């Protein structure tokens, strides 16, 4: 399987990798000692293999998605080889990673970051997905929200804005000032 982040996003959005079941991780109760817990929302998408997640209370298979809200936790029980695609929604950037468990150890297959800029589309989609936790049986709607969120991620990856360094920005500002006031 090819592990380029943009390619994976496109395959999840347009096929042939289709989203199946959307699960919602636990965000209440005591957190197990080795559980994964971060302050940002994230998606865990199974690409290959299968694993049981205590936080979701289910066995996840290819195409299944686990949504972990900010402050929530998940606790995967790796019993056979599996490959997952994770999207972490930080305040300033998105983080993408593809991780494989081969039955003995983890291997990072891909890792990428992109700045969260522009309209707050992603924030509103995450808020909508948070609301879906109360109606987790509405799977068609949950799949469409996750697909929209993945599409937004692909849009951000495709239009990465290059930010000039501070010295470059200062140089350009001085040059523009001189051009505006002293050019003849």
Task: Outline where the language-model segments fall.
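Generic protein-terminus/edge-of-domain signal
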Residues: 1-60, 78
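Short, conserved loop/turn and helix-capping segments at secondary-structure boundaries
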Residues: 40, 81, 165-168
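Broad gene-expression machinery/nucleic-acid interaction feature
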Residues: 42, 84, 184
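Hydrophobic alpha-helical core bundles mediating ligand binding, dimerization, or RNAP-core interactions
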Residues: 44, 125-132, 142, 146-154, ...
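Short, locally clustered residues in the helix-turn-helix/winged-helix DNA-binding domain
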Residues: 47, 154, 179-183
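A short, Lys/Arg-enriched amphipathic alpha-helix from helix-turn-helix/homeodomain DNA-binding modules
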Residues: 118-122, 142-146, 162-184
């Amino acid at each position: 399987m090819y592990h380029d982040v943009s390619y994976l996003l496109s395959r999840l959005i347009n096929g042939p990798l289709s989203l199946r079941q959307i699960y919602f991780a636990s965000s209440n109760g005591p957190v197990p000692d080795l559980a994964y817990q971060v302050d940002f929302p994230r998606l865990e998408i199974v690409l290959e293999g299968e694993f049981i997640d205590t936080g979701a209370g289910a066995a996840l298979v290819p195409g299944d998605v686990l949504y972990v809200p900010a402050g929530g936790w998940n606790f995967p029980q790796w019993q056979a080889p599996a490959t997952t695609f994770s999207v972490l929604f930080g305040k300033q950037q998105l983080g993408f990673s593809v991780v494989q468990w081969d039955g003995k150890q983890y291997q990072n297959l891909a890792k990428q970051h992109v700045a969260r800029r522009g309209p707050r589309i992603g924030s509103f989609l995450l808020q909508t997905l948070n609301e879906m936790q109360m109606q987790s049986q509405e799977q068609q709607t949950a799949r469409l929200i996750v697909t929209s969120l993945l599409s937004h991620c692909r849009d951000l990856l495709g239009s990465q804005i290059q930010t000039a360094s501070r010295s470059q920005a200062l140089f350009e500002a001085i040059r523009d000032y001189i051009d505006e006031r002293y050019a003849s």
